[in-house]
């Protein structure tokens, strides 16, 4: 009787344990999928949500096994290297950039090696979460079917999200927390989206092969999922994603065929690769163009940019301590070292995961990372039959290709991709595990879980509620709040917010710029000058910094505004005309100190002359134009396009008699000044000469194509049936002119030209009719109506 009662209780315990294990397995496999879904966890609140779930898992099911003394030593040393940044800076080599920040710019840096310890601490906690995740997935005591379950659940989750990405892209919509500019996928960086799809594609091959081997029809579903992944990878426009998918598939199929030692298996693998390549070409015929295989000259552009970024990164490494500059400091400090890699955008990273790691943690961290990967890969072997060898090989290939790709990209520095790769690497291990249990590991990771839970929850709450939490979250909140107070005119509060945030991020140029603008409004001139100088030093590329400085100084210290604007023009590069045009406000043009200087700048630079002439008053236009011609009488510095634009503006706003006088002296300028000359001829009553100039030098007019050769009678019948059809109207006009029926053609053209929204070319056709009738004045007037309609249409 007692045994009968114990048996159901034992079954209940077994069922409860099985349910618990199933939930735990599903949670582990779903965490990287959740990170991908939450915008790739690129925002701090998204990362906080992911780490919160990881922390809860650590508290509920902490790792019970140890990875071994050597692996533990490597991971512990990596964490210590990251924490070295909090040691006193005086213990290490003092780089020149730190001396410049402290001595020249008088920035109050903390005494730690990292110039921004609160920012470094934020990233250190994320690093600790990554190491904890590695330990969790690598020490799971799983049965072989549980390994398959986790890998299949992860792969199907990514395939489902790929399908959702395609659906959103087709519907021209997206989720609020997805950050891609093209509305495809969650990541802002297309390579991170493509890489994750490529990894999933490799895993799909293993899943499909396993179902096919076991005689299950699920392999059909996996093939459909692979099609979705291929389409999504192509739509992501990621070369690296396509490369990982194709190369990884080739390695896995090659290894599969080699292990089978069967010609049919080899043929099947080759056939599948050819089929995959065919699918890629069918979906995207320009795939080779994207890999730049057709144009070696253009291929060298991106390669050259990489090498220049790498060159400047190595300059930063040489000018920094052996242990790096600390987490979270690359962007701020690298801007100071950009010499060989100039550009109009701020470099957020060195285009390489490995160089990024080297810069922030030093070369020992790179060596230890390679050793750690080697130790983990060593635990993958042997790949014997009956050990999920197909799944594990696919996971290993995917992880290694991702690490290799990290040489020239930075996908490993995002939670959404890093957690996925760590998951695959951890499940590629040979099981059952040959690891020793350790009670200390459970205690350690529960403590880590508590720390991560507290910090991640605080991060989520602070990010969503714009709380001033010390670290990167608080800095972002302070920027948003200071923007609000600045718009409201509460400049004292703006200064207070930015000053507080600068204690956490003393190398943030945006904070100095915002504070400086507020200081100008409060007449704190000395402080504003210092903060503007700091902002320009920390952001030496963007023209927006000195442009904003000049705008702030203009009402109070005009000469300081001019100095800042000169720097903005120096930085602007090809954007100089737009930047200069933004300076030509009513306030600057009416300022007695600024206006002459802006005129001097505009009339001495060929690319700035047109913005200046467009902005000056009609009374000043002719005087400014005369000065321009004195500075450059032959317009040698102007390009052909600039000459055409200059004379078009001159014809519109200038003195037509002066244009005539200049063209008489310089006959070769007639091809630029023909419109002004035509207006001059018309003003003198010579409408024929005016009209003929438009026909000689005017641009060809776009008119509808005539594909049919219908008779005049047929066209008249069609026109009477559809009198509002522009195409039929043009065909009828054309047939009437060919048959010499000019008066009827004129009526047809005017039928449309007198309507307000008709195409501009009907005015042109009307002008042709009047010219055919020798009525040159009306031909000229009709052509002017055509030109004005075209101008309105382009605005």
Which residues make up each language-model segment?
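Soluble catalytic regions of membrane-associated enzymes that act on cell-envelope
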Residues: 461-669, 678, 683-684, 698
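Hydrophobic alpha-helical transmembrane segments
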Residues: 77-90, 129, 146-176, 188, ...
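Transmembrane signal-anchor hairpin modules in multi-pass inner-membrane enzymes, especially those
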Residues: 1-156, 206-223, 250-275, 374, ...
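Loop-to-helix entry and N-terminal half of a specific, functionally important transmembrane alpha helix
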Residues: 26-33, 155-158, 221-227, 348, ...
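Transmembrane alpha-helices of multi-pass inner-membrane enzymes
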Residues: 53-58, 202-204, 244-253, 274-275, ...
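Helix-loop-helix junctions and helix-breaking kinks within/between transmembrane helices
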Residues: 37-49, 165-168, 188-191, 223-254, ...
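A membrane-periplasm/extracellular boundary helix in multi-pass inner-membrane enzymes
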Residues: 88-91, 169-178, 227-237, 241-245, ...
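TM-adjacent membrane-interface loops and short helices in multi-pass inner/ER membrane proteins
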Residues: 189, 307-348, 354-357, 361-367
């Amino acid at each position: 009787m007692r045994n009968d009662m114990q048996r159901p209780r034992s079954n209940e315990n077994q069922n409860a344990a099985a349910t618990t294990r199933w939930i735990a397995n599903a949670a582990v496999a779903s965490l990287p999928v959740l990170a991908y879904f939450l915008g790739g966890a690129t925002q701090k609140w998204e990362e906080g949500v992911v780490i919160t779930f990881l922390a809860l898992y650590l508290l509920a099911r902490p790792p019970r096994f140890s990875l071994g003394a050597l692996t533990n030593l490597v991971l512990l040393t990596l964490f210590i290297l990251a924490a070295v940044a909090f040691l006193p800076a005086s213990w290490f080599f003092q780089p020149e950039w730190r001396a410049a920040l402290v001595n020249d710019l008088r920035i109050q840096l903390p005494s730690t090696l990292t110039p921004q310890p609160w920012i470094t601490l934020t990233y250190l906690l994320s690093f600790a979460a990554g190491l904890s995740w590695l330990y969790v997935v690598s020490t799971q005591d799983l049965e072989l079917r549980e390994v398959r379950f986790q890998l299949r659940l992860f792969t199907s989750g990514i395939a489902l999200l790929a399908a959702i990405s395609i659906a959103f892209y087709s519907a021209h919509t997206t989720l609020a927390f997805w950050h891609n500019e093209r509305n495809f996928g969650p990541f802002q960086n297309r390579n991170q989206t493509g890489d994750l799809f490529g990894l999933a594609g490799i895993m799909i091959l293993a899943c499909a092969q396993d179902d096919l081997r076991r005689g299950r029809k699920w392999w059909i579903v996996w093939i459909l999922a692979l099609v979705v992944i291929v389409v999504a990878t192509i739509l992501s426009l990621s070369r690296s994603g396509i490369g990982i998918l194709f190369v990884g598939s080739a390695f896995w199929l090659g290894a599969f065929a080699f292990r089978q030692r069967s010609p049919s298996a080899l043929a099947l693998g080759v056939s599948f690769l050819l089929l995959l390549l065919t699918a890629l070409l069918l979906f995207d015929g320009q795939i080779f163009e994207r890999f730049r295989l057709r144009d070696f000259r253009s291929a060298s552009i991106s390669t050259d940019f990489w090498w220049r970024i790498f060159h400047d990164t190595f300059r930063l490494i040489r000018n920094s301590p052996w242990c790096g500059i600390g987490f979270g400091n690359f962007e701020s400090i690298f801007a100071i070292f950009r010499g060989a890699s100039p550009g109009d955008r701020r470099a957020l990273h060195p285009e390489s995961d490995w160089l990024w790691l080297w810069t922030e943690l030093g070369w020992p961290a790179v060596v230890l990372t390679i050793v750690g990967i080697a130790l983990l890969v060593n635990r993958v072997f042997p790949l014997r039959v009956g050990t999920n060898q197909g799944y594990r090989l696919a996971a290993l290939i995917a992880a290694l290709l991702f690490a290799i790709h990290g040489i020239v990209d930075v996908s490993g520095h995002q939670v959404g991709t890093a957690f996925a790769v760590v998951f695959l690497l951890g499940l590629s291990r040979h099981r059952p595990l040959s690891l020793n249990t350790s009670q200390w590991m459970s205690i350690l990771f529960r403590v880590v879980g508590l720390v991560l839970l507290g910090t991640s929850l605080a991060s989520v709450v602070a990010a969503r509620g714009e709380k001033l939490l010390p670290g990167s979250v608080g800095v972002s909140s302070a920027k948003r709040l200071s923007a609000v107070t600045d718009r409201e005119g509460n400049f004292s509060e703006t200064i207070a917010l930015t000053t507080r945030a600068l204690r956490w991020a003393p190398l943030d140029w945006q904070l100095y710029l915002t504070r400086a603008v507020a200081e100008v409004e409060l007449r704190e001139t000395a402080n504003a000058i210092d903060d503007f100088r700091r902002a320009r030093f920390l952001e030496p590329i963007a023209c927006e910094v000195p442009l904003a400085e000049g705008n702030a100084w203009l009402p109070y210290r005009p000469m300081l505004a001019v100095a800042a604007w000169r720097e903005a023009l120096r930085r602007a590069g090809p954007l100089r005309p737009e930047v200069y045009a933004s300076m030509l406000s009513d306030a600057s043009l009416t300022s007695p100190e600024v206006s002459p200087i802006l005129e001097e700048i505009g009339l001495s630079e060929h690319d700035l002359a047109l913005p200046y002439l467009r902005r000056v008053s009609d009374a000043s236009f002719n005087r400014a134009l005369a000065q321009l011609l004195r500075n450059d009488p032959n317009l040698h510095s102007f390009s052909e396009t600039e000459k055409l634009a200059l004379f078009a503006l001159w014809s519109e706003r200038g003195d037509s008699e002066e244009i005539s006088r200049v063209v008489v002296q310089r006959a070769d300028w007639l091809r630029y000044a023909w419109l002004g000359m035509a207006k001059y001829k018309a003003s003198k009553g010579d409408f024929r000469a005016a009209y003929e100039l438009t026909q000689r030098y005017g641009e060809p007019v776009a008119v509808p194509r005539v594909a049919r050769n219908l008779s005049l009678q047929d066209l008249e019948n069609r026109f009477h049936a559809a009198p509002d059809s522009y195409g039929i109207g043009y065909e009828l006009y054309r047939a009437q002119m060919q048959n010499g029926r000019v008066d009827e053609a004129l009526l047809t053209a005017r039928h449309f030209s007198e309507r307000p929204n008709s195409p501009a070319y009907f005015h042109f056709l009307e002008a042709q009719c009047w010219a055919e009738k020798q009525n040159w004045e009306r031909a000229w007037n009709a052509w002017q109506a055509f030109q004005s309609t075209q101008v309105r249409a382009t605005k």
